[in-house]
Amino acid sequence: MIVTTTPNIEGYQIATYHGIVTGEAILGANVIRDLFAGITDFIGGRSGAYEKELGRARETALSEMEEAARAKGANAVVGVDLDYEVINNMLMVSASGTAVTIA
């Protein structure tokens, strides 16, 4: 499945629009607390463990979005947007886009 942030896919025509699809992943309070503690410990550097955890959450959100697109009969998702939001000491990663069939 092609997933892109652009509104169209070069070399393809959008044959059908299937609507908006989303996927979410939430990191629990302990991960967030540890994440912010780690940030203060790694000022000026990078924490591979925390980046890996955020990457896992992002991949989960994108996978859920792709599954939702497949369920609608789509073979691509265009206009994808990723958002990160802290809610009640938890980090939510959400992915949204428009499910389409390309030809």
Swiss-Prot record:
It comes from the Bacteria. Coiled coil: none annotated. Belongs to the UPF0145 family. This is UPF0145 protein RHOS4_20440.
